[in-house]
Amino acid sequence: MAKQVTGQAKFQVPGGQATPAPPVGTSLGKYGVNLGQFVQQFNDRTKEYNGTPIPVIVTVYNDRSFDFITKSPPAASMLMQSAGIAKGSGVPNKDKVATVTRAQCEEIAQKKMEDLNARDIDQATRMIEGTARSMGIIVDG
């Protein structure tokens, strides 16, 4: 007999630094999931992304067991790391906060390719460049 899905939760947690506090506790507590077990498994799986926000999708079953899928870090956080800034521009059309090269955008697109809705690497690179522009980051090259 297959397990019946009780619910699904989506949230972002810093890689390798999950705790039972929000957003993990508030999202999974209502399903009765063992938070300590989730935190330990998540931290083990994402320790190489220490501190980088990682999107996670948790599927909870009727016996309170769970499976989770981790996605690649958001493009915005990868761009901020590449550009060496803490946050994007509040007024991206007027204030430019940093510069990245097209090669850096292509590298980010390579890492995010499986999560992006793009047919090839060129389309994915253009999507990353659009994200950079909307953050007030200039794309050179």
From Swiss-Prot:
It holds the Pfam family Ribosomal_L11. This is Large ribosomal subunit protein uL11. Keywords: Methylation, Ribonucleoprotein, Ribosomal protein, RNA-binding, rRNA-binding. HAMAP family: Ribosomal_uL11. PROSITE patterns: RIBOSOMAL_L11. One of its GO terms (cellular component) is cytosolic large ribosomal subunit. Part of the ribosomal stalk of the 50S ribosomal subunit. Interacts with L10 and the large rRNA to form the base of the stalk. L10 forms an elongated spine to which L12 dimers bind in a sequential fashion forming a multimeric L10(L12)X complex. Belongs to the universal ribosomal protein uL11 family. NCBIfam families: L11_bact (TIGR01632). SMART domains: RL11 (SM00649). Forms part of the ribosomal stalk which helps the ribosome interact with GTP-bound translation factors. Residues 1-23 are annotated as: Disordered. It comes from Rhodopirellula baltica (strain DSM 10527 / NCIMB 13988 / SH1). One of its GO terms (biological process) is translation. The keyword Signal does not apply. SUPFAM superfamilies: Ribosomal L11/L12e N-terminal domain, Ribosomal protein L11, C-terminal domain. One or more lysine residues are methylated. Gene3D superfamilies: Ribosomal protein L11, C-terminal domain, Ribosomal protein L11/L12, N-terminal domain. GO terms for molecular function: large ribosomal subunit rRNA binding; structural constituent of ribosome. The lineage of its organism: Bacteria, Pseudomonadati, Planctomycetota, Planctomycetia, Pirellulales.
